[in-house]
Regions:
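C-terminal charged capping/lid subdomain of soluble metabolic enzymes
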Residues: 170-172, 269-329
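Short glycine/serine/threonine-rich phosphate/pyrophosphate-binding segments
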Residues: 93-100, 233-234
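A glycine/threonine-rich phosphate-anchoring loop and its flanking beta-alpha core
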Residues: 8, 12, 100, 104-192
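Glycine-rich beta-strand-to-loop/alpha-helix junction loops that act as flexible
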Residues: 58-59, 89-91, 227-228
């Protein structure tokens, strides 16, 4: 088992990491799950006496204020006080929404992240960003609040489909493209079935944690992590509006393809990245820019009435705050 020190909490990684689930000093414990993690993952946790289970429906379209009301109501009717803790057992939706509910319930109770998807392990559970979607726009309501701890156990990867693994792998690819050319070369030249997942999780978390610790509130270099996410969030919001939700990682991969075209890459580098993604991932159709524009102009990262991108200036390097008007895209 490995410990990575984040800003104010520890990230535990390994097959024995669940032994670090410490709830001894809390008055009450709730475990937030969806129908999938209740079925596949809940039994893998150590037994917690006198805990309650809060089950919510799965899916990005359920990451909204209505589901939060359900969570808050369960906490309230069970008389949870400020010395209680919420354990978020699930993917990015559970972690984002559960963290938001905990941080706002009675002005804040502790929460522990136990991510069960690759995407949540390498990205969503790290860094203290929590929130929900609003008015059809991705992550419009939220705040920064760190968990008490993050517990990452590769055993949960066995519960995932190949599509879910590939969705999480999108964030791994992003981390390599923005910071580490050597890591990108290893990933892009290794067969998916031959990947060492624990090693990949370890490296990816270290990349994100280093960036976040230096800029926890995303005032400067943390914006590097937004590569692929301006177009990516617009694509994800578009498919949600069409009632054809896609995985977050799928939208990020399509965002990477589009944002590479805006980046200061050589043509060979653009072709290398695009060909790798198209060859190795079965992606939905990329919507036209006209269909994405209303989502782009409402992106929370925008500045000066312009659309804000993080872009590559080479594989392993990126620049932040690249501003474009609608006409320039």
């Amino acid at each position: 088992m490995k410990e990575i020190k984040a800003d104010s909490y520890s990230i535990w990684i390994g097959e024995t990491s669940l032994s670090k689930l410490d709830i001894t000093n809390y008055s009450m414990v709730a475990i937030l799950v969806d129908e999938n993690t209740k079925r596949e993952c809940l039994s893998l946790l150590p037994k917690i006496n006198n805990s309650i289970i809060i089950e919510v429906p799965s899916g990005e379209e359920k990451k909204n204020i209505s589901t939060c009301n359900t969570i808050w109501e369960k906490l309230s009717i069970n008389n949870f006080d400020r010395n209680s803790v919420l354990i978020n057992l699930g993917g990015g939706v559970i972690g984002d929404m559960g963290g938001f509910c905990a941080a706002s319930y009675k002005r804040g109770i502790d929460f522990i992240q136990i991510p069960t998807t690759l995407l949540a392990m390498v990205d969503a559970s790290i860094g203290g960003k929590i929130g929900i979607n609003f008015n059809g726009l991705k992550n419009q309501i939220g705040l920064f609040s760190n968990p008490k701890s993050v517990i990452i156990n590769p055993i949960f990867l066995k519960t995932l489909s190949r599509n879910q693994l590939q969705s999480g792998f999108a964030e791994v690819i992003k981390h390599s493209l923005i910071t580490n050319k050597k890591h990108w070369e290893i990933l892009s030249n290794t067969s998916f079935k031959d990947l060492d997942w624990q090693h990949i999780i370890d490296i990816s978390i270290q990349i994100k944690n280093t960036i976040v610790k230096a800029d926890p509130l995303e005032k400067n270099n943390r914006k590097k992590l937004n590569f692929g996410h301006t177009y990516g969030h617009a694509i994800e919001s578009y498919y949600l509006e069409e009632k054809k939700p896609i995985l977050h990682g799928e939208s990020v991969l399509m965002g990477i393809i589009l944002e590479c075209e805006l980046s200061l890459l050589s043509q060979n580098e653009k072709t290398e990245i695009k060909n790798y993604l198209i060859k190795n991932f079965q992606l939905p159709d990329i919507p036209s820019k006209n269909k994405l524009m209303k989502f782009l102009i409402n992106d929370k990262k925008n500045k000066e009435a312009k659309i804000n991108f993080t872009l590559l200036n080479g594989i392993g390097n990126c620049t932040i705050d690249n501003l474009f008007t609608e006409d320039e895209l």
